[in-house]
């Protein structure tokens, strides 16, 4: 007995049978499909379809992008090839084989670098391809290999398998479909036989008994919902009288016509004939079209493999180019003037040709790109060869954290290689670097040393060698350093622990503490940030908190002089010194607010750090408590809360408001505004001329204020007119509609009153009018009866006269007949007399 071991290399015939079987049975009945293939199991058939024959499988060469994605996903999800395959767009077997090949290439590259690859031979290379199998080896995964060509002489088993598959696959209908088709053919034959019998009997003069008419409509004889067409303009009697000749002498097959199956066979025969006639021409055209298509696909593949061109953004705009041209023209003019003069002055001006170096300028070469595929393959190979981490050895050496695809996401990291910018590259062989520490601010590129023929500046100069520029650069560095220190967070807790030997021994013996949960750590850090933000908001001044008006620009020295000049002469020097300290603190706080919270229109440069030393929160709290206690004692409310103090101060202010207003009015009457000093002065201290000038200035100021207010009001009115114009139009329309509705209501009321009045008049006059009409109707009825009687009498007389006329006509006819008869008898008698006489 011959034993057949299923499996092995797939052949072309088996692939074709498998594809035909899948097209018939689908991709779920693998047991039925495998019954057509003698040497294959259902599992092998399924693997063959999903690993090789499926049209969606990519069999082209792997690209660099796919290799990077494969290695990156293998690093994130090791050995999960079923998950990686749909992301890469390949099958799991293809991904695994490509992964092993990349690792083998990385190993070979490392061996070449270490000088270990000289003694290798062909037998030591891995067999990654089915065609590279050594003698005696068996391919463990033949479902992923190309099919082997069919042999010229097939075995009997293969021929039997092929014939059986051809027979089974040709039968596209099942048993039930066959039975239904056979029943339809029998029904059609029965119907045709009955029709032929009926026609033959009718031709012989024998009519079959008609079936009893069913109730309802016979849809075979009648037309449901039939509507006769309307008669037209033309005579159609000839068409209706046309007699159709009976099909005498015609066979039933000719009357029935050709069936659909016969028509399909004729059409298929024509197609085969046409295909056979133009087979040679089509073959030549197909070969040419196929070559053109292959060429087009190769061109597209080359285009896809090209690196994307990334050009740098333009460093010089149109306006700057025009300025550069003007500067170059100015230099040329200066050179011509010097050249026309004395030879002694020619050495004072260097040769600064605008396009001198631009003629030989070349775009710097793009930096070499790292091979991410090889780097990732080496890293993965090193990780696979590493020992278990429980041994405590060093970590696996990787090829740099910046090289590779990274761990940022599911897709590999790509470094875009842009064309270098020649303007950002130093002409002396180095790349421009900035010495500033403020982020986002760069130094001016080396402009003067590019064309320094007189060697005024050295190679490393940026701003020049003037002392002013050096001091400016030093001050800027200090300011940036201070800003960096100011941005550092303040320490929350300061602890100093002196650990003894006993503590060290206990720490070694104690168990390690558990690691803090990430969610708890994030919540703690968030609470700390919110607390720090709240403290920063509380450190703001009251003016900033309440949004009170404040000056845009603050001159600390002038403000301090004005505040100190307002201090009343104090007998106590300590109080005067205290007032000065308070004024100094106020001036510094106002300057800090203008820098930290600038207003629109300020002249303070942005990014400037305030020099105000913010007091500690504890000191501020103690000062507020002291002020609160002193204010409560002054108001006679010791121990009162802030709310009670606020109410007490408000009540005291309301009591003194009237007195203050009266005192201010009296004081205001004795003051005038002096335009010369721009202050309010006493009237008694001015001469009449100065007083009139002050009044004139006040009148002009009032007039200007009135004009400004009028202008503002006009602008507001215009703005409101634009905003409310639509609403005004709608209001006018609504008002007009309301007026129209009211007029309609009034008109309706008038009509109703008129009709009510008419109703009353009609109700009063209707009875008399009805009585009169009834009398007229009675008269008309009586007259009609009389006329009807007269008509009946005359009608009877007419009938009598007609009867008399008919009787007279009959008598007349009878009389005429008698006369004619007598005349005829007389003629006969005369004839007899004549004959007797003769």
Curated annotation (Swiss-Prot):
Residues 498-519 have a biased composition (Acidic residues). One of its GO terms (molecular function) is DNA binding. Keywords: Coiled coil, Cytoplasm, DNA-binding, mRNA processing, mRNA splicing, Nucleus, Repeat, Spliceosome. Residues 114-155, 253-285, 433-452, 490-539 are annotated as: Disordered. InterPro entries: CDC5L/Cef1 (IPR047242), Cdc5p/Cef1_C (IPR021786), Homeodomain-like_sf (IPR009057), Myb_dom (IPR017930), SANT/Myb (IPR001005), SANT_CDC5L_II (IPR047240). It comes from the Eukaryota. It holds the Pfam family Myb_DNA-bind_6. This is Pre-mRNA-splicing factor CEF1. It comes from Cryptococcus neoformans var. neoformans serotype D (strain JEC21 / ATCC MYA-565). The gene is CEF1.
